[in-house]
Amino acid sequence: MLKHVAAALLLATAMPVVAQSPAPAAAPAPAARSIAATPPKLIVAISVDQFSADLFSEYRQYYTGGLKRLTSEGAVFPRGYQSHAATETCPGHSTILTGSRPSRTGIIANNWFDLDAKREDKNLYCAEDESQPGSSSDKYEASPLHLKVPTLGGRMKAANPATRVVSVAGKDRAAIMMGGATADQVWWLGGPQGYVSYKGVAPTPLVTQVNQAFAQRLAQPNPGFELPAQCVSKDFPVQAGNRTVGTGRFARDAGDYKGFRISPEQDAMTLAFAAAAIENMQLGKQAQTDIISIGLSATDYVGHTFGTEGTESCIQVDRLDTELGAFFDKLDKDGIDYVVVLTADHGGHDLPERHRMNAMPMEQRVDMALTPKALNATIAEKAGLPGKKVIWSDGPSGDIYYDKGLTAAQRARVETEALKYLRAHPQVQTVFTKAEIAATPSPSGPPESWSLIQEARASFYPSRSGDLLLLLKPRVMSIPEQAVMGSVATHGSPWDTDRRVPILFWRKGMQHFEQPLGVETVDILPSLAALIKLPVPKDQIDGRCLDLVAGKDDSCAGQ
């Protein structure tokens, strides 16, 4: 079995990149059946990092592979929402398979401050165990410790210990937040060495084979991808600081790990790993239902590095469609009865420099005065505490924490001056205090109609959230203009460009329908749980079951 898996991996990863042809179109579906007639044997949950609803819809007419299958044969919710304010990778992934918003998962951001942490670095990473000696937010031991609720896989395993729960991803936080604390296997791309897991977890024979295949792929240069016809109009240079973006093809030298990671090659490797894991572990081939979650991280790396509207992002989506098609075809060939859900952890926003070229002259980069060091100096001066550390934050938006060394009187002055200064700043939409957010009821109703403070409440976890929450205005990119640019674009805002994501369900033979009204990613868990007849108490989650049966039947009946 392992030799067969290894051969398949090498075939998938060693083909000349520019010569790969699109996956064949899926065979015509048989007569429609109810998606809920019998429980599927395998749940395949896919997150495409930074796959915004805008990016999904922009190229929808060009899909020929896996995305075409999902959009033409499945249940399509093009207006899904990561409904909270802090639209970052870790909080977003924490919602997908828990049915819970960050206010319940405890994952309020990628990083937050714990000023009582027993180490010098008070900035905590969402997927670390900060109690480990010598750890920091940059050099950490990965852990699901901070996730406060079970995932779908965890609930399935609690109901039936025979259930296999596997999670693979490009990023550790994607694999960990979707897999949960009790997953059987959790793997992520840890660097040039390949896929890794938690400290002390040795590679299985399969993972060793996967990493050998990865090493062989990495050792080959990539001459670049051909430019699809739909990408030709995107092919023009855009200057952002010292960076020029917009015309890339993902060419890289042999051994260039960074180039591999920021390209469609990464997702192709992760999907090859997932397919090999399904075959090797015989997922979906036993009496119980198994689950595999797959975090495809390349779209996010591409979006940050090049923006969302150049050739780079266009090629990335085209390749994603092709690779997903090949992955689904492999599962079909193996005769597995599987259900797919595909969504994203958040959306994204293109770089202001290209927006200004394309009818949006008001697009801006954030004022350097709002960056952490500058903001602390300003507030300290205004509060009569020049040179003192008065606030902690890690960006020009998001949570702000008061220093623990302030007296009550100093803290009051700092809050007064911070609110006065920030609320008067032309790039700031609003600033909420912790008390204001805490007093707001947990939101309900259509996510597209929520107010900003309701979005903030969905991101709020009292023991982790800051004393203030700073939200920038729309069309203000939270990366300042600099002579030397790292990332040129990002996400994380409370606006719909970052909140809206597609949510797509598919199972062989189901009747296609599309529902354009807003739903939430927290609705995914109860919807899948209903298909496998897994009871989930409604008071333990924030989502609702989505009926995936077109017409009068109801896949949520009995939930």
Swiss-Prot record:
The residues responsible for catalysis, as annotated, are 89 (phosphothreonine intermediate)
Q: How does activity depend on pH?
A: Optimum pH is 9.0.
Report the EC number(s), separated by commas if there are several. Answer: 3.1.3.1
Give binding positions for substrate.
Answer: 110, 171-173
Cofactor or coenzyme needed:
Zn(2+)
Sequence positions that bind Zn(2+) 1 = 49, 89, 345-346
The UniProt record gives the binding positions of Zn(2+) 2 as 300, 304, 491
Q: Which Gene3D superfamilies match?
A: 3.30.1360.150, Alkaline Phosphatase, subunit A
Its primary localisation, in coarse terms, equals: secreted
What catalytic activity does the UniProt entry give for this protein? Answer: a phosphate monoester + H2O = an alcohol + phosphate
A single cellular component GO annotation: extracellular region
Which GO terms label this protein's molecular function in UniProt?
A: alkaline phosphatase activity; metal ion binding; zinc ion binding
The chain's disulfide connectivity reads 90-126, 231-314, 545-556
Describe what upregulates or represses it: Constitutively expressed.
Q: How does it assemble?
A: Monomer.
Role summary? Alkaline phosphatase with broad substrate specificity. Precipitates uranium from alkaline solutions.
Descriptive protein name: Alkaline phosphatase PhoK
Organism listed in the record? Sphingomonas sp
